[in-house]
Amino acid sequence: MDRKNAWTTYSKEELDRLEQVNTEYKNCLDAGKTERECVTLAVEKAKAEGYKDIRDIIKNGEKVKAGDKLYAVCMNKTIALFHMGTKPLTEGMNILGAHIDSPRIDVKQNPLYENEEFAYLDTHYYGGIKKYQWVTLPLALHGVIAKKDGTTVQVSIGEKEDDPVFVITDLLIHLASKQMEKKAATVVEGEKLDLLIGSRPIEQDETLEEKEKEAVKANVINLLKQYYDMEEEDFLSAELEIVPAGKARDCGLDRSMVLAYGQDDRVCAFTSLFAMLDVKEVEHTACCILVDKEEIGSVGATGMHSRFFENTVAELVALTEGESDLKVRRALMNSRMLSSDVSAAYDPMYAEVFEKRSSAFFGKGLVFNKFTGARGKSGSNDANAEYLAKIRNAMDAQSVAYQFAELGKVDVGGGGTIAYIMANYGMEVIDSGVAVLSMHAPWEVTSKADVYEAYKGYKAFIEEMR
């Protein structure tokens, strides 16, 4: 079943809208390089569209009615938005779910050290990365430093033109004969992913008898005190993430693609957010949940396994229909969801791992995966045929370009998403997302046409699904 390349179908007006969506998308990628930054950005955009914090509604004893727009935040790393419909919650919601964490390198809690007059930050990588891809790149440092006095300092170094950047070094080719014989998984080891952050000793009084032994480290500590009013001990309560420095860029002479960090899964997260904020009226309550920790198993308080979403739905049921555990269960069971996560784009350079008839292609629209998992569909959510038919109808109703695919050839590999977690409530769930080249690399590639079709598809799902 061949699908048209969406680029061949657009009018001048649609091409203008496509570029508008992609410009906003690139701006969001630049502003949201961590899960915290994504939540901050989502809250700003939601407030601008009239969304209110559910905590304020509860505190003020207000009731919630059709048309109301609410959001709830969990620990500044996960957010759920709700646009209340005319039908009761017990008839189910139309849910868009994506994750906003991406593979990266994290700074450890006791990280700062000096070695032969180089200052480093000790690190531990997060998520599935090819470690060798992260060396010799300009890197930025993002995150927060929580201090004992209760204040939190925001950190972002390496994104402005006049900012310094950081780097993880690699062995020169002239001395790398043994290194080049290693397997790709071990050619760069995890303990060698430490971040080079300085080499200049602190200025010292030459008349002093006892001089600073680790003068480069001392200089870094001095600079941290100067710029962030932090002590070395404050690393203990810091969350600092190392990400590629630089902005999202148009890719290709024809500017048909986007090259950027973190498009898994922010391409689905931001297009879901755009769709959610653009919807005017809904019958079934619309929900957009953007979660943390998917890349490491959706665990913890801010991952999809958390009770945060269930608890928030319980609060909404209480605010609309009165407290009832049974009504909460009905609201969840009767819901419909798009688990919005990226798909592997067919790459002609690595054609041997793909089965073309079941592959996702650039420019052919939103990708649906009936199932994910590995080997014999292990760990998969396998969507029902009846639900797939409804999905097709919703997409066709708004002329969305879409395709169905799997993740590579059978037995070659596999992957998972948050779909199976939400399916545990008994709701209908299918994986849907955007095809990505170089997935999990520091810089990933998407098609602008697919970004636009994802936005259209997510909006159609909210408006058309019954």
Summary of predicted features, one role per range:
Residues 1-466:
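N-terminal hydrophobic/helix-forming segments and targeting peptides
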